[in-house]
Amino acid sequence: MIAKIKSRVDFSGIVNYANNVKEKSARIIGSNGVLLVDNSTISDSFQAQLRIPDANGKLHHLSKPVKHVSIAFSPEDVARFPDNEDGDRFMAQLAEEWLLEMGIDPANTQYVIARHFDKKHPHCHLVFNRIANDGTVISDSNEHRRNEAACRRIKQRHHLTFGNS
């Protein structure tokens, strides 16, 4: 398992990529706090959250409020992620565990997890809002160091293949 984190300015572009049914054979396998009618309503849900004021009543002005995490698993673990409900559920569980390992409460965070089938290795895309449901900002301080540790713990816990990252 390898997770690559990118910061984004705009929700609509990354939502359209993550949930690209035509080119990526994508399907949503997990979410919280977003309307899943279509990509536009997903993006609008994220955008609305940016208007939640902080504890002092001020709006946040993050230059990059969007986090996009590409979570890839080893081809050796493909049998752990069958193309069915069980495989989707397990992959979504691991993405939610990644959030927790990063110190992010999935119950207090808007996110969507989309599974892709355009590569030989199992993978998904996690898009989340840096403005939590309670109006606080989700820290991205030391996220690369925390990410490495989170992936290592999840791989150990679930006996996933270790490889070069």
Residue ranges and their predicted role:
Residues M1-S165:
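N-terminal nicking endonuclease/strand-transfer module with a His-rich metal-binding environment
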